[in-house]
Amino acid sequence: MFTLGTALSNQIDANWQTYVMIIVYFIILLIIGFYGYRQATGNLSEFMLGGRSIGPYITALSAGASDMSGWMIMGLPGSVYSTGLSAIWITIGLTLGAYINYFVVAPRLRVYTEIAGDAITLPDFFKNRLDDKKNIIKIISGLIIVVFFTLYTHSGFVSGGKLFESAFGLNYHAGLLIVAIIVIFYTFFGGYLAVSITDFFQGVIMLIAMVMVPIVALLKLNGWDTFHDIAQMKPTNLDLFRGTTVLGIVSLFSWGLGYFGQPHIIVRFMSIKSHKLLPKARRLGISWMAVGLLGAIGVGLTGISFISERHIKLEDPETLFIVMSQILFHPLVGGFLLAAILAAIMSTISSQLLVTSSSLTEDFYKLIRGSDKASSHQKEFVLIGRLSVLLVAIVAITIAWHPNDTILNLVGNAWAGFGAAFSPLVLYSLYWKDLTRAGAISGMVAGAVVVIVWISWIKPLATINAFFGMYEIIPGFIVSVLITYIVSKLTKKPDDYVIENLNKVKHVVKE
């Protein structure tokens, strides 16, 4: 019987090639960070949004890489390995959600954020869209971003720590710090341009990795007959419905609802050169996502047979990709595949750090400093943005220092928080002329509160009744939709010019 350490020791301990690949990967990221620093950090819009000059292909892979994170390479394969094919309902929901997002949200958001005061953050857009002169919605939505993204970012650091602990035998905390130092460097100095370029680069690496590992695993095992072997081990392994419930399927499928309100994803739509380039971005982005998720499912399924055949004791299912990549491949290739995991983790961390930083700077600091001074203090705002990156990273690292949950659960909680608070509001903002400031604030707060209450007090009751175990985005999203609608209907309608802006957006998008 092998332990995880035994399975990896012969592959890594004496193979400097693996380390070389990781070091080369880190050097490339640092170079891109320096390039971003030289090219586009002169003002806050450039630092936070790339000056709205990003092309469709970088937009597509940047959105995909920052979306999928370590979850696609570590979380999803581990889930499929543990529960079988029934885990793929989440991938169906996510793919549909992402596809609809490109059609429903992307074009209007790109146009509307520019028309509505050239907003560079989601809270700033809400404020301008609803003519909130008191900045109440800007402050509340900014707080939601800071709280949930700190939680979300810490899940990425947990993934990085786990990677170095599992693959290299390093102390978890040492691995966490290595990832933190690199990602903070290129985000701190390079801003949005560096983050987008590194995301594109990392997205390519991730895709290659997710295609390579399951194909080589099949060749090493029993070809297509491997799936017959997997079914023989446990009938539920290849059954979409067995081993789960209707409520479980609905919960997994409902992850797709979160796409419309994820700031680190939809900010990509805000930064593209023109809304007319979004179809190109959509075709590449959805294709990348579909192939990557299929690969992750393939890793999980082939891993069932692979681990069993080699009598490996897999202590943590989320390390499945690491184990397979290091046993199946030459150390040089293994190093590349480990870099793919780092790519998945770091692309998301950098995006989340930047969005949180932009919220702290644009939605809080500039508010305190005084918007009338904004044009003459761009360097100051960029500096505050950089310091905010550092501050959020330190807080997230502190929380991640003592991990006590799985990557999937950590991501799930934050995803639900944004999905319930922002998804309905984004959709209402882009399509409904009767949305009011009071309705928006009430619905947003209600969605976030329901998610927090459900996670903290309702979900633990699932042992009594399975209904309480449903994914928290469902009740949060429903409550947010209803509260926003009801309160908007009961309060004063928006001014005419707000409605005129909405009509202008519709006209521009149709051109």
From Swiss-Prot:
It is found in: Cell membrane. The keyword Membrane applies. It comes from Staphylococcus epidermidis (strain ATCC 35984 / DSM 28319 / BCRC 17069 / CCUG 31568 / BM 3577 / RP62A). Coiled coil: none annotated. This is Sodium/proline symporter. One of its GO terms (molecular function) is L-proline transmembrane transporter activity. GO terms for biological process: proline transport. Its main location: membrane. The keyword GTP-binding does not apply. PROSITE patterns: NA_SOLUT_SYMP_3 (PS50283). It is a multi-pass membrane protein. PANTHER family: SODIUM/PROLINE SYMPORTER-RELATED, SODIUM_PROLINE SYMPORTER. The chain crosses the membrane at residues 16-36, 54-74, 85-105, 139-159, 175-195, 199-219, 246-266, 284-304, 327-347, 381-401, 407-427, 438-458, 467-487. InterPro entries: Na/Glc_symporter_sf (IPR038377), Na/Pro_symporter (IPR011851), Na/solute_symporter (IPR001734), Sodium:Solute_Symporter (IPR050277). Catalyzes the sodium-dependent uptake of extracellular L-proline. It catalyses: L-proline(in) + Na(+)(in) = L-proline(out) + Na(+)(out). Gene3D superfamilies: Sodium/glucose cotransporter (1.20.1730.10). One of its GO terms (cellular component) is plasma membrane. Belongs to the sodium:solute symporter (SSF) (TC 2.A.21) family. Keywords: Amino-acid transport, Cell membrane, Ion transport, Membrane, Sodium, Sodium transport, Symport, Transmembrane, Transmembrane helix, Transport.
